[in-house]
Every structure is written in structure tokens, then in C-alpha cells.
Amino acid sequence: MEWPINKPIYDINKSWEDNLENGPFIEGYKKVDRNDNKDPSKYIDFLGQKLASPIGVPAGPLLNSQWVKFALEAGFDLPTYKTIRSHEHFGHPVPNVMYLDLESEDKQFTKSDSGSTLHATQTIPTTMDQLAITNSFGMPSMGKEYLYKDIALAHSYLGSGQSMIVSITGTASSAHDFLQDFVDTVRIACDAGAKMVEVNYSCPNVVTGEGQIYHNPDAVYEISSTLVKELSSKNIPLIIKVGVMDDLEKMERLFQQAERAGVAAIAGINTLSMKVTDKITGEPSLGASRLTSGVCGAPIRSAALDWVSTASSIIKKQNSKLKLLGCGGIVKPEHFDDFLNSGADIAMSATGLMWDPYIAMKWHNNNKNN
């Protein structure tokens, strides 16, 4: 159960479609018994769902029901079904994931590093502390009929003390169509039996005039309040996914507007957006049209923890009822505790799961509090 056993369960040399159809790639994986199965009376309550633990997977790596099934069996009690759209959408071509060349093994970025330049490398890291990747998928999505069946199938795999979030986003060419598309997408999630919905505000969008929606608290309010109206009659809570913010006042306003809209929880961070280029040529590593991409893995943990701590402070300051989901850089089991101790109600790992599918079980079986 130590690095490296096998290649990541997501094959970075294959397309997103290939990984969806044939993954996760778990040859050599040995299922581990979980030693912390609790009495249901001791489950934690999160947005009305009873969970055996606060350990989850954020939107991204769980491409369909088979990926969700694997995460559930691997000890993640709150997986997120990857971001869906209202219609089939093809993502970017391979490469979608590349390793990054860091200055040192313990390199940690801060939020002020967003937008800086890094270089891709073919060198495979040899420890989880060295695990740094960039990813650019374009948020691909399967079509409506597939999603109805597959999200329902994913729900059928839930065991006692487990639940699932369905992540959504909007797609359109005008502000009005954009809002309606969010509604159309959330209806797919609801019709498929979603217990919780997360709306992704942390990926680029040109319609609002902002690089990312979460930087515009008023746009967040408008979209979120519309979605809450759709969800409230079905008693489905809304979570919003955001990223790092340099402006504390704007972050405080974001939280105010989110709660005012009826949002139940805020998740962060997604990735750190950086420029990734070839060290020799200076050309974009992922292709000419993708100069900027998301950085994930070990080196964003500091920025993510900073976000969680700040978010927790804002919630206390505002006497808010918002819950927090923290993610970013959790690549070792003890990192879950770092996030929980910093104020997160739920701690989530994506890159950590992909490269170490035992990470959640290590936490369960080694955690003295369980």
C-alpha cells in the first residue's frame, strides 16, 4: 500500500472517453477491509445526509457510475459525480493531464501564484509529495439519456453512511440562455435522483464578463437563487464550487450572496490556474489553444488550506449556516485531518485518489478518532 504500486487509476495517456468506458484502471489493486465501520447512530449529518465519515471526492475524477462505485468501495463516503452539462459535450483532445517540473519536492504555491508559468515534464514523480499535475479537459459530458441511467446506477451503489453529490455547470452563448441552461442541467440531476447538487462556478465562463463566475458575487446570487427555487421543493441542497480569491472583501460578499440565495454549502478550491509551457520551446504544453490550465496535486495544498481557514473565519464572522467542503492537495491520509482541523466539514481528494486509491482506507484504518 505504498507508492508506487501501479500507474494511476486514470490513464493519462488515454482519452477521457476511453477512461470513462474502460476505467478505472485498477490492475493489481487489492481491496482493503475497513476497520472503522460505525454504529449508524454515530454517523455525521451533512446537509441532511447521514455519513459514516467526512471523507469524499470532489468533482473531476469520477467519470461515471463505475468510477463512483470504485470510490465508494475504496472508503470515500461522499463522492461527487463529475460535472455534467445539459447536452453531450466533447472535451479537449489528449493530452489532458501532464506532470509538472517543480523547483523542489516540498514546493507549495500560494493564491498569489495564480497565473504564473510552470513547465511540464515527462519525469514521473516517485513520491506523493512530488505529485504535481496540470489538467485540461474542457468539462466534457455525456448526453441526457446516458446521464439519467448512469447517475441512477451510481446511486444504487451507495452503502450505509454514504451519499453522492452531482456536479453541474451551464453552457450557452448569452446571459439569458446561460441561466436557463443551468436550470436545464439541474433538472437532469434531479430527475436522475440527486441527493445533493453542486454547481461549478470555478471554471472559465465568458458570458458574465468575468474570468470565473465566482468572482462575480451578484452573478452567483442570480444563478444560485434560480437553482435553489428548482431544488427546494425537492428538498435537495445546493453546494457551490469556487476557487481562490485575493480580495477578502469580495470573498466575504460572495459568501453573503451565496447564503442569501439559499446555498447550503461552499466547496473549494478547484485548482490553481497557471500557464504551463515547454521548458525548451516556450510553447503551451497542452496545445496552442490551452495556454492556461489547472494545477493540482501536492503543491496546491497550502493555498487550499488558506482558503478553508479564511472561509471558516468568514462563516463565523457572518454567523452563517453555510457548510464547507475542502479540497486541493490532499495526497496523503493525514492531509484529510489538516483540512478538517482548518474548518472543513468535508475533506476531499481527487489527485490523491487517482495516484493512491488506498488513501481513504489508510485514513479510516489509522485514524485514532474512529
UniProtKB/Swiss-Prot annotation:
Pathway field: Pyrimidine metabolism; UMP biosynthesis via de novo pathway
Catalyzed chemical reaction(s): (S)-dihydroorotate + A = orotate + AH2
Cellular component aspect of the GO annotation: cytoplasm
Organism: Dictyostelium discoideum (Social amoeba)
Family membership: Belongs to the dihydroorotate dehydrogenase family.
Active site location: C203
Protein name: Dihydroorotate dehydrogenase
Cofactor(s) demanded: FMN
Top-level lineage group: Eukaryota
Enzyme class per UniProt: oxidoreductase
GO biological process: 'de novo' pyrimidine nucleobase biosynthetic process; 'de novo' UMP biosynthetic process
PANTHER family: DIHYDROOROTATE DEHYDROGENASE (FUMARATE), DIHYDROOROTATE DEHYDROGENASE (QUINONE), MITOCHONDRIAL-RELATED
Role, per record: Catalyzes the conversion of dihydroorotate to orotate. Participates in the pyrimidine biosynthetic pathway.
Lineage, broadest ranks: Eukaryota, Amoebozoa, Evosea, Eumycetozoa, Dictyostelia
Keyword flag Flavoprotein: yes
Co-factor binding details: Binds 1 FMN per subunit.
UniProt EC number: 1.3.-.-
Keywords annotated in UniProt: Flavoprotein, FMN, Oxidoreductase, Pyrimidine biosynthesis
An annotated Gene Ontology molecular function: dihydroorotate dehydrogenase activity
InterPro entries (UniProt xref): Aldolase_TIM, DHO_dehydrogenase, Dihydroorotate_DH_cat
Keyword Oxidoreductase: yes
Residues holding FMN: K82, T83, N200, K241, I269, G297, G328, G329, A350, T351
Positions of substrate binding: K82, N135, S136, F137, G138, M139, N200, N270, T271
Encoding gene, per UniProt annotation: pyr4
Pfam hit, one: DHO_dh
